[in-house]
């Protein structure tokens, strides 16, 4: 299927894609399994942004990215999950795929 996306939600010249949320690691900010996530493709984000990230080539995950001086923190928004702190060479294995721009719920 497809999701109609109003042009005002998009910046021209940038690439976007939709993902369907899996898991419950971001429920405290209202992202639940089955929700649709509009992601703007980009390989870097600001500290505090919610992004699609893969580590060590693993499946992509949606987490809040917090940048520290010598570390990168992947913070879930559910206290049942632990944050992942990456330091040193571990940070080289992190690949940001894009930034969350919009959440759409389907009932």
Please annotate each region the language model reported:
Residues 1-107:
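Acidic/glycine-rich C-terminal interaction modules and beta/coil loop segments
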